[in-house]
Regions:
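N-terminal Rossmann-like NAD(P) cofactor-binding subdomain of oxidoreductases
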Residues: 1-190, 226, 254-255, 259
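Charged docking surfaces used in two-component/phosphorelay signaling
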Residues: 74, 163-262
Length: 262
């Protein structure tokens, strides 16, 4: 698709925190949209959103939504279950799907893309393109230029993730905690607290969030780099942070590192 050609675009999960950010960025960057279609669950159907000064109504996502509306590009952020069901339906109509969930990230037939890191991998797509976990993106954008020069041997990543990573309800829980209102999203109190668990634990003591960092890093770099990770939820609305310890195969000094990152 050429950037100056207007296309039909769909947002799946338009009522969610990420879906709303999709809409904001499309508007800010003046993306060449011919027709915009907003989809979400039945609960959000009928809600209205303003885009480029026009009012759009959110529709319930249906099996025929993509074929009926001749959608060229669909941005999915409605969770893995929805993506697993509807992304193949959309791609079969000729629509290109960019999926923000974990549904397709580790599928061998689906490229996992960070534009600043592995853009050429997108050429292998068959209709579905996955983007990594937010913390993976944050880490690898910084690590890629270092890996190219010094070759990474081992990485230890500690992430400190804002409640926005848990969606609108995560933000509400933080705000409600200050008012002593019972929270709904987090198992433990998040107000004035750090929770050293994001998602469920496996038998080895890693959470799903931590394993995403391990597996996605190896897939994107196409190498079996040793990675270990810790993920902590912290009581701030936005902005994740990370502390990364890296072991390289090639020799270096700090001046080399700074020069590469600059």
């Amino acid at each position: 698709m050429k950037s100056n050609k207007e296309i039909n675009v769909a947002i799946v999960g338009a009522s969610g925190l990420v879906g709303q950010k999709f809409i904001q960025i499309l508007q800010e960057r003046k993306f060449p949209i011919k027709n915009l279609f907003l989809f979400a669950s039945e609960k959000s159907a009928g809600d209205k959103i303003i885009f480029n000064g026009n009012e759009y109504v959110i529709d319930k996502l249906e099996d025929n939504s993509f074929q009926k509306n001749k959608i060229d590009l669909a941005l999915f952020s409605a969770g893995a279950t929805i993506s697993k069901k509807f992304a193949p339906i959309a791609s079969c109509t000729g629509c290109i799907v960019i999926d923000n969930s974990s549904a397709w990230r580790m599928d061998k037939t689906v490229p996992l893309i960070i534009p600043e890191v592995n853009p050429k991998d997108i050429l292998s797509h068959k209709g579905i393109i996955a983007n990594p976990n937010c913390s993976t993106i944050q880490a690898l954008v910084a690590l890629k230029p270092l890996h190219d020069v010094f070759k990474i041997k081992r990485v230890v990543i500690s992430t400190y993730q804002a409640v926005s990573g848990a969606g609108n309800q995560g933000i509400k829980d933080l705000e409600n905690g200050a008012k002593n209102i019972e929270q709904k999203k987090f198992r433990y109190p998040i107000f004035n607290n750090c929770i050293p668990q994001i998602d469920t634990f496996n038998d080895f003591g890693y959470t799903k969030e931590e394993l995403k960092l391990v597996n996605e890093t190896q897939k994107i770099f196409h190498e079996n780099i040793k990675v270990t990770a810790t993920a902590v939820r912290i009581p701030v609305k936005n902005c994740h942070s990370e502390a990364i310890n890296v072991e390289f195969e090639n020799s270096f000094d700090m001046g080399n590192i700074i020069a590469v990152l600059e």
